Each structure stands twice: as structure tokens, then as C-alpha cells.
Amino acid sequence: MKFLLVVLGFIGFLKDGITVGGESMLRGVYQDKFYQGTYPQNKNDNWLARATLIGKGGWSNFKFLFLSPGGELYGVLNDKIYKGTPPTHDNDNWMGRAKKIGNGGWNQFQFLFFDPNGYLYAVSKDKLYKASPPQSDTDNWIARATEIGSGGWSGFKFLFFHPNGYLYAVHGQQFYKALPPVSNQDNWLARATKIGQGGWDTFKFLFFSSVGTLFGVQGGKFYEDYPPSYAHDNWLARAKLIGNGGWDDFRFLFF
């Protein structure tokens, strides 16, 4: 059963308790430039041709580039971390106005991402950490972060949150979900639900929109649909194709 949902300017549908559809601003880095626009609606929608250029160059040099739940842009460049409101036009010098909130050591992380409540998660040296994000360049984040995973976390290809607070992950060829670990004694993978049987390691990008729609890039093509819920749910077979080719060429792609 589907119900129309209108919340904070988003319009979508509830299907089996999961919001699908809705308007979100897609951001991407392509050939060193930064773009934004509403996400493509079908395979003939040339997103790059209609997207707004919001950064002229240098964006491919970032190791991480992602948004907080509050809409601030975070970036790791040259081992340092910065934050600021996202750029809105191509003459907006984001690095010139962004606040440096970490002086060094940020290249050590394999994953860096937010949960829906604004906590920052990171994987370093096979371990998973969680803490509120740094506020200044003297804030030693890793020293105060809580270790919530004691090993095995470098083996994941994707780690990211659904807006409902569940952690989603790709390990090997398989896709999993569960509430995040709360301590380093919590064997997350052992208790997680398998929601994808194989082939998930072939995706280049895999991420949620703010309303819980799953987006993925595989084989240069861009897909969207509500996320799988059980191991034999063939997501790629039922997902909507919204990009015919070239999506593998993006350096970053996110909401």
C-alpha cells in the first residue's frame, strides 16, 4: 500500500514503511568540477547538461566530500578537514571561506560519514569510531571518539546510513543492514540482515537520498528504487534506470 507523504518540502510515497521518490538535490564532481541539480527522472534526462556548475576546479583533489544531515558540506583535503555551507555558483570560493576543523591525520580514514543524528563515523586501521564532529582545528577527534568496532571494518566496500538510522553495508558481494554497533564487543556483521545475495561489489556508488530512496551506479548506469529488504530481492532488476551511461566517470556523487 502507498501513501502520499509531504514533509518539509519533500513529496514521496510510503511503501512498506519506506519512503520512495521525493525531490532531492544531487551533487557530483565530474572532471574536477562540482555540479548540483535535481536528480535525473529517466534515462533520457541529461543531468550534467542541465546541472548548475558550483565549483570550477580542484574538487577531484578531495579524499572525502559529503554533506552532514544539517546540510553543511564537509571535505578532506591534504590530510585536513573543512566544513562550510555548500557552494551555490561557480565563483563561490568554498575553500577560501570554509572552516578548518582538523589539522592533520584525516587521510588515515577509509570511510568517513554521518548518521542521521549528526554523529560522525569513521573507519581507521580496521576499527570503527563514532563521535560528534570536530568544531575546530584543535579538536582531536580520534582521541575522543568511541571505538564501536574492534576489527574487520576495512573489509567493507560501502558503509552508509538510511535516514531511519539503520546502517547499510556491502561486504564481499553481499548487502547487509542493521542498527549500528554500540560498542567494540558488538559483532555487527553477525547480527545484520542480509538483503542482497550477490553482485553488490560491482557498484561504484551506492547511497540514499534524504527520503530513503536507494541510488546506485553500476556499469556506468544510474539506478534508483526503494532498498531491498531480503536476500533474494533482485534490486537491480526492478530499479528504475535514470542514467544511461557515463556515471562511472564521476569522482563524487551524493545527496
From Swiss-Prot:
Residues 1-19 form the signal peptide. Monomer. One of its GO terms (cellular component) is extracellular region. This is Tachylectin-2. GO terms for biological process: innate immune response. Lectin that binds specifically to N-acetylglucosamine and N-acetylgalactosamine. Is part of the innate immunity host defense system of the horseshoe crab. It comes from the Eukaryota. Pfam families: Tachylectin. Transmembrane segments: none annotated. InterPro entries: Tachylectin2, Tachylectin2_sf. Keywords: Immunity, Innate immunity, Lectin, Repeat, Secreted, Signal, WD repeat. WD repeats lie at residues 20-67, 68-114, 115-161, 162-208, 209-255. It is found in: Secreted; Cytoplasmic granule. GO terms for molecular function: carbohydrate binding.
